[in-house]
Amino acid sequence: MTQGKIIKVSGPLVIASGMQEANIQDICRVGKLGLIGEIIEMRRDQASIQVYEETSGLGPGEPVVTTGEPLSVELGPGLISQMFDGIQRPLDRFKLATHNDFLVRGVEVPSLDRDIKWHFDSTIAIGQKVSTGDILGTVKETEVVNHKIMVPYGVSGXVVSIASGDFTIDEVVYEIKKLDGSFYKGTLMQKWPVRKARPVSKRLIPEEPLITGQRVIDAFFPVTKGGAAAVPGPFGAGKTVVQHQVAKFANVDIVIYVGCGERGNEMTDVLNEFPELIDPNTGQSIMQRTVLIANTSNMPVAAREASIYTGITMAEYFRDMGYSVAIMADSTSRWAEALREMSGRLEEMPGDEGYPAYLGSRIAEYYERAGRSQVLGLPEREGTITAIGAVSPPGGDISEPVTQNTLRIVKVFWGLDAPLAQRRHFPAINWLTSYSLYKDSVGTYIDGKEKTDWNSKITRAMNYLQRESSLEEIVRLVGIDSLSDNERLTMEIAKQIREDYLQQNAFDSVDTFTSFAKQEAMLSNILTFADQANHALELGSYFTEIMEGTVAVRDRMARSKYVSEDRLDEIKIISNEITHQIHLILETGGL
């Protein structure tokens, strides 16, 4: 423990002297109030400290005391359904302790509740040899999550005592005699420094798709479990709604939602909506698998920088249990702005647009902690972390540094488009500029598992949209009547794909989520109509005849997005009606 004194205060940056015994990344208690800070730079005996609380009122001469520990999070039962700030202070218990709606400075509240007793079921025998990552037992944390208690990193030996029963998270549950003869007394909780990635046994190639229930994502721009995706877009294009939708309905075991520097109302929406929503995969409330980290725009800037690391460390902990985890960061641009502010106060040489030169490596550091891994310990298991980051480029300009550095690392780009949002087409993901490098592998995976020709259907649908884009210019110049019947049919089919398939209402109880089976049935109907109508044109029918003769069936196709999942047969029989209607047109018209 080192004690120094403040010599300079500049916003969230405090400089203290007499700190020659301190280490970089040590946590400090700053000033008489004991504000939490982290050492980010050392020069001789002077330490630059970024303070995670409001620094107004601090002055030179006040004490600074180091704890000798890095910024760490507590990992154990009690994380799920909780809402923390950027440095893992529980907001509900913080309010109870301070009787204040705002964060009172210098108050210490344990991250995990020390009073709740959790029922621990041991799955291991006394005398058994264990090592890092081995599962010792489970705690039923919620109806959905079985919290697995693992041997902490760096501990191995023989179990000399372990018991099932009810324990608080700081009571000794098991004892291990280590190889050097010393004893390790373990609790249900462990600590881990947030800036250090948790180790794994082996990195694996992600293959299984993350099913989100959002048709434009699952069909055209899929992300795998263990993949990384970016959602850049201008203000009002729907970044937060896309993130909320994925957080609500993704087929993962755990969701960690980091609200980083965005509006407080958006976190309020999450708190109001999530408890009422039922997870289609488990039938339980979505909050029973969710951890929220709220670091809204009016909270201290430095804590924004920590919130991303806090979230990804929690995600790694659940991954080590063998779970699939999705982490949403909304928005990484605000996190980058926090980096820029601290860099400016440190008087570092600025890079592009004032961001620090190390922006790219920091962004890469975050996304590289995602992935599919074989984790340490027995029984052998795999875990995945899928990282989805929103990016808010000023004015929607994706050539700015945060977006460009993000796109260098992630493999999926869901580009939100202001003109689409203005036309009320949501999700406003532009199908011409977005891309997914997982598309082929996901298509092959689905074709093999579901025994379908999903990959070829997606390719055909995308071809229609691309052809529509090239025809639109002709239509704008000389009008739609100048097109041939074949080209007009192409425009009509592309319109059906856009409006009846890609457009989705997040606020409709049925349309908000679409299972893979329903997605395939809807797309198959559109492509069946395309095949039958093209066939009719070849046999001499006119485009207007086909449109007039299929009004009713096309209306049913458009309404199929509002047909509930338990009535899928109603969607599947539409293809027979399409064939029947086209046959009637051929019998009564054409050549």
From Swiss-Prot:
Q: Which UniProt keywords apply?
A: ATP synthesis, ATP-binding, Hydrogen ion transport, Ion transport, Nucleotide-binding, Translocase, Transport
Broad enzyme group: translocase
- Establish whether keyword Nucleus is in the entry: no
> What reactions does this protein catalyze?
ATP + H2O + 4 H(+)(in) = ADP + phosphate + 5 H(+)(out)
Q: Does the keyword Metal-binding apply?
A: no
The entry assigns this protein to a family as follows:
Belongs to the ATPase alpha/beta chains family.
Q: What is the recorded name of this protein?
A: V-type ATP synthase alpha chain
UniProt lists the gene as: atpA
